[in-house]
UniProtKB/Swiss-Prot annotation:
Its EC number is 2.1.1.199. The keyword ATP-binding does not apply. GO terms for molecular function: rRNA (cytosine-N4-)-methyltransferase activity. Belongs to the methyltransferase superfamily. RsmH family. One of its GO terms (biological process) is rRNA base methylation. This is Ribosomal RNA small subunit methyltransferase H. One of its GO terms (cellular component) is cytoplasm. It is found in: Cytoplasm. Pfam families: Methyltransf_5 (PF01795). S-adenosyl-L-methionine binds at residues 47-49, 66, 93, 108, 115. Specifically methylates the N4 position of cytidine in position 1402 (C1402) of 16S rRNA. NCBIfam families: 16S rRNA (cytosine(1402)-N(4))-methyltransferase RsmH.
Length: 310
């Protein structure tokens, strides 16, 4: 079995979350689907989930999607041994349409360890770097540009809606005051310090950093993550053959609620998990970032069973 961690010359090192949990329902698919079938990894990252499934199912083919050039380079290196069974596409999943239906479509919605741990990507409040946060560093507005553009009330609403941050108005007021008085923040550490200062002293020493929710909100906004997820959940069932499997790993309640609702209400799908699967204690001990992961599965119904055919 391949190791799901990535250690490559690209510097992309990542431990895939819930890899075994994803592999089990894939293994339960009928052999006729897996024989020469296509798998679409909509968030390829370093290729850990895909490598595991390609290893276990030698007749499976892969199309891997990712907008992050660093991730694509790492995945290409990691998956090279699978040869022409693998195709990597530089795209956001919302802009993709497959030429043929797939037997498996999966998406891991989390920010990868390399994105969090490389300061220059600007995702981390623990490592000082530019206030960027773009998944695709060549496209779109940075977090610094976003907080500079928004009015205080707009920024507060964004932090509350996307970060579920109860101190959103206090934080937005502090950010806009700092920008007006001092100019742009020097980097992520300065913003994290400002956000932490909005909390009472005792609340700054908890397990969760005070800036966590604000940084989550800015990252979601910069990358339009929730709208992209909604569009993916609308499109993905049509990428599947009847009986095909849709697997989504989410990392916060805003994502999980959308996945749960889509799997429950979409008449093209049969929900396979009433409650999401979560990481085992052993996995959490080995990879603490798996603590918040939730995995849900659905099966594509035969066309005759969908509402359109009734």
């Amino acid at each position: 079995m391949p190791d799901s961690s990535i250690n490559s010359d690209s510097g992309f090192k990542h431990l895939s979350v819930m890899a075994d949990a994803v592999s089990q329902p894939v293994a339960a698919l009928p052999a006729e689907l897996l024989d020469g079938g296509l798998m679409i990894d909509a968030t390829l990252g370093g290729g850990g989930h895909s490598a595991l499934l390609l290893e276990r199912h030698p007749d499976l083919r892969l199309i891997g999607l990712d907008q992050d050039p660093t991730a694509r380079a790492a995945a290409a290196e990691r998956l090279a041994l699978f040869g022409d069974r693998v195709k990597i596409v530089a795209t956001n999943f919302v802009d993709f349409s497959p030429a043929e239906p797939a037997v498996v479509v999966m998406a891991d919605l989390g920010v990868s360890s390399p994105q969090l741990d490389v300061a220059k990507r600007g995702f981390s409040f623990r490592l000082d770097g530019p206030l960027d946060m773009r998944m695709n560093p060549q496209v779109g507005e940075t977090a610094a540009e976003l907080i500079g553009r928004l009015e205080e009330t707009e920024l507060a609403d964004l932090i509350y809606a996307y970060g579920e941050e109860r101190l959103s108005r206090r934080i937005a007021r502090r950010i806009k005051h700092d920008l007006a008085e001092q100019g742009p923040y020097a980097g992520t550490a300065a913003l994290a310090y400002a956000v932490a200062g909005c909390y009472p002293p005792k609340a700054r020493r908890g397990r969760i950093h005070p800036a966590t929710r604000t940084f989550q909100a800015l990252r979601i906004a910069v990358n339009d993550e929730l709208d992209a997820l909604d569009r993916f959940l609308q499109k993905a069932p049509d990428w599947l053959v009847p009986g095909g499997l849709l697997a989504v790993i989410s990392f916060h309640s805003l994502e999980d609620r959308r996945v749960k609702t889509a799997f429950l209400r979409d008449q093209r799908l049969e929900r396979l998990t009433r409650k999401p699967l979560v990481a085992s204690e052993m996995e959490i001990a080995a990879n603490p970032r798996s603590r918040s992961a939730k995995c849900r599965f659905a099966r594509r119904l035969p066309q005759a069973m969908t509402a359109d055919a009734l």
